[in-house]
Amino acid sequence: MVKVLDEHERTMAFAEVALGQIRSLRQTAVPRNYEIWYIYATGYNAPLNKIINETLARNGNLTEADLEQIYETYLSHI
């Protein structure tokens, strides 16, 4: 039971980061954006995190076109 609770808390933390990013960047709360930010929060996809960090550093935000390109490049094949 403890392991299940730990997994619940760990995954809820990822979910909170994902929703926090969507809120702070004023993005639409659609499944694609949630998936992008959830994977970002886990740190399991280093290339995705790198391109997001670079784009945010360069532009200060992610456009819908950026999000679509990120999804198509780094997540649509999963």
Predicted regions: what is each one?
Residues 1-78:
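Extended alpha-helical signaling linkers and dimerization cores
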